[in-house]
């Protein structure tokens, strides 16, 4: 009788997998949840199903590459102007992901990767274009600042850290990361410090260019999972950079002088010819850009060779900046109007006020990037006072307010006036 009772107690204490029904003695591991149990075999089966689904979804994404027209239509919703740069980028990105979609289908011709160089004045939309592109294609995207990079073994960020950031953006999914986009900003700051090779090692300029060559062309990068410096006891993640699209961008201050002065014959004395200064704006001069100009600026020929597609961006004029303020889906005016809506107040700008804001941004030579700081300065006092005021229905900003000659116009609701009349 006692033997039967013992066996009964054992069966009561035995735990079973809620999915396959196997007992804890039949499997290696049983994981407990709040009210359920799952065995290691069911976990492995689930992982296999998820892997297969990820592969199939990846194939679908590869087959559904957006056309250049579709890409440029979405870019137009967010980025004002820069039509030439948009065309170059949309065609380049379409061809890149089309190449990835069909590389496994045909083995006769191997299509090479074409990385992109964006050249344009500060605040003209280089970084924003790259961010919007990654959002359209729905691939992992990361940004890196070239000024923080140093050659391996020196204080600063290793080049491999760029791939680590991309891996983190892909939630450590190596397959997704290997199809991502990397944007390297301020690439003009890693130019060679002098035309002549120096005895001392240039670890943050030419050294970084040399370090970027292999990952931009395609190599197996060993990435430490936690980031930072490598050490022998650490396990590495292997990431193939062959199919990662690299977009480099920079303002290249002073490059316009190199382009304008190309082919000039210098002479001195009474017979010297004085050439009139180039009165074109920076964006127009950049259209005549040649690889030799970039070499003279300080980029090494091997680095330029890894960036076969060059897209130049134009200066933003007053009309373009006014459109940037009001037209895109996430325009600055719309952002501040939403902030004021949270206080149940309508915010309105006169057209001439927006033009004055645009002119101020051009005077500061900060492009579209300077618009936010100007808007903050104009609306600071209003945003400070508004939460404490009652009955304000609308705030109107005129050109005099932007110039500092007047205060914003507050329009109060009729309810407060009615209350005053009743009390009287």
Swiss-Prot record:
One of its GO terms (molecular function) is ATP-dependent protein folding chaperone. GO terms for biological process: cell division; proteolysis involved in protein catabolic process. It comes from the Bacteria. One of its GO terms (cellular component) is HslUV protease complex. Belongs to the ClpX chaperone family. SMART domains: AAA, ClpB_D2-small, zf-C4_ClpX. ATP-dependent specificity component of the Clp protease. It directs the protease to specific substrates. Can perform chaperone functions in the absence of ClpP. ATP binds at residues 121-128. InterPro entries: AAA+_ATPase, ATP-dep_Clp_protease_ClpX, ATPase_AAA_core, Clp_ATPase_C, Clp_protease_ATP-bd_su_ClpX, ClpX_bact, P-loop_NTPase, Znf_CppX_C4. SUPFAM superfamilies: Glucocorticoid receptor-like (DNA-binding domain), P-loop containing nucleoside triphosphate hydrolases. PROSITE patterns: CLPX_ZB. Residues 5-58 form the ClpX-type ZB domain. Disulfide bonds: none annotated. Signal peptide: none annotated. Zn(2+) binds at residues 17, 20, 39, 42. It comes from Bartonella henselae (strain ATCC 49882 / DSM 28221 / CCUG 30454 / Houston 1). Component of the ClpX-ClpP complex. Forms a hexameric ring that, in the presence of ATP, binds to fourteen ClpP subunits assembled into a disk-like structure with a central cavity, resembling the structure of eukaryotic proteasomes. Keywords: ATP-binding, Chaperone, Metal-binding, Nucleotide-binding, Zinc. Pfam families: AAA_2, ClpB_D2-small, zf-C4_ClpX. HAMAP family: ClpX (MF_00175). This is ATP-dependent Clp protease ATP-binding subunit ClpX.
């Amino acid at each position: 009788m006692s033997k039967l009772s013992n066996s009964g107690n054992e069966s009561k204490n035995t735990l079973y997998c809620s999915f396959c029904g196997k007992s804890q003695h039949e499997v290696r591991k049983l994981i407990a949840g709040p009210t359920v149990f799952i065995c290691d075999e069911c976990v492995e089966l689930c992982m296999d199903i998820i892997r297969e689904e990820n592969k199939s979804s990846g194939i679908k994404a590869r087959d559904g590459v957006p056309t250049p027209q579709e890409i440029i239509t979405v870019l137009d919703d967010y980025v004002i102007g820069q039509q030439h740069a948009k065309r170059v980028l949309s065609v380049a990105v379409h061809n890149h992901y089309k190449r990835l979609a069909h590389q496994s289908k045909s083995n006769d011709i191997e299509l090479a990767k074409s990385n992109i160089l964006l050249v344009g004045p500060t605040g003209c939309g280089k970084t924003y274009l790259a961010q919007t592109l990654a959002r359209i294609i729905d691939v992992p995207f990361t940004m890196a600042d070239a000024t923080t990079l140093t050659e391996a073994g020196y204080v600063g960020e290793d080049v491999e850290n760029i791939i680590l950031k991309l891996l983190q953006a892909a939630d450590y999914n190596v397959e997704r990361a290997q199809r991502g986009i990397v944007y390297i900003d301020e690439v003009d700051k890693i130019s060679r410090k002098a035309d002549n090779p120096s005895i001392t090692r240039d670890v943050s300029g030419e050294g970084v260019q040399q370090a970027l060559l292999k990952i931009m062309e395609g190599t197996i990068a060993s990435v430490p999972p936690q980031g930072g410096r490598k050490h022998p006891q650490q396990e590495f993640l292997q990431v193939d950079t062959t199919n990662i699209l690299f977009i480099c961008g920079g303002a290249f201050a002073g490059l316009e002088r190199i382009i304008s002065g190309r082919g000039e014959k210098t002479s001195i004395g009474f017979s010297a010819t004085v050439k009139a200064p180039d009165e074109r704006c920076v964006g127009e001069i950049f259209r005549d850009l040649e690889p030799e100009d970039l070499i003279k600026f300080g980029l090494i020929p091997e680095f330029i060779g890894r960036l076969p597609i060059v897209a130049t961006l134009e200066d933003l004029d007053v009309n373009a900046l006014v459109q940037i303020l009001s037209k895109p889906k996430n325009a600055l005016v719309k952002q501040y109007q939403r902030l004021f809506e949270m206080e149940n107040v309508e915010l309105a700008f006169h057209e001439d006020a927006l033009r004055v804001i645009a002119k101020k941004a051009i005077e500061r030579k900060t492009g579209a990037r300077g618009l936010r700081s100007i808007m903050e300065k104009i609306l600071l006092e209003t945003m400070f006072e508004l939460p404490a005021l009652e009955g304000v229905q609308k705030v109107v900003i005129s050109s005099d307010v932007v110039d500092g000659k007047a205060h914003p116009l507050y329009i109060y609701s009729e309810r407060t006036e009615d209350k005053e009349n009743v009390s009287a």
